[in-house]
Amino acid sequence: MENNYILRRLRYTFDINDKQMIKIWANADTTVTREQISAWLKKEDDPAYIMCNDLNLAKFLNGFIIKHRGKSDGPQVAPESRLNNNIILRKLKIALTLRDDDVIEILALADKPIGKSELSAFFRKKGHQHYREMQDQLLRRFMQGLQTKHRGENESPQDVKVDITQEKQQNNSADQTEDAGINSHIWNKKK
C-alpha cells in the first residue's frame, strides 16, 4: 500500500495538523519540516508530490505509538526499513490499544467482516505455516473503518472514494471470473 495514503488517512481520521505531525515524528527522534509533510500529503498527480519511504512511515508510526501509549522504558524500537501491510496494522493496533475484537469490529464498520483466525494469521511471523500477507484492500478497509469509528463518518476524502470504487470493480471482475470458472467446471462435468 502507498505510504502517503496511510499518512493522509491517519491525518484525516485523527484530525492531526502539521504541528502535531512534526511532534509525532519528533517522538521517534526524527526531524521533519512542514514542507516535507506537505509534499508527502499531496496527491500523486500533484507536481510537488514526494513519495514517503518505508523508513519515514515506520518512524511516524513509532511516534504515533508513543503519542498514544507514552514512551517505553529502555531503548526505543528501531524503525523498520521495509514495511508491509501486516506491520502497519500491528503498529496501529499497538498505538490505539486495540484487541482482536476491536480490529474485527473496525473492519465490519467498513463492510469487510473477517474472523479471528483470519485476523491472527496477519500477526504471525513470516514463515509460520499460518502466516498470511495482508492485501492492500483489507488495510484500506481497516483505515476506512477507523475513520468511521473515530470521526463518525461514512464519507471518505476524495482520494479514498476512488480507491474503494476501484476495489469494488476488482472484486466484481474477480467474482465474475470465479463464477465463469465454476460454471465451466459444472458444464464439463455434465458432458
Feature roles, as predicted:
Residues 1-2, 33-35, 161-162:
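Short N-terminal segments
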Residues 1-13, 79-92:
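A short, Lys/Arg-rich alpha-helix, primarily the initiator
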Residues 49, 53, 81, 85, ...:
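Residue-level marker of regulatory loop/turn positions in helix-turn-helix DNA-binding domains and
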Residues 19-70:
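Acidic (E/D-rich), amphipathic helical modules within compact regulatory domains
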Residues 46-50, 78, 92-93:
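Short, surface-exposed loop/turn motifs that are enriched in glycine and acidic residues
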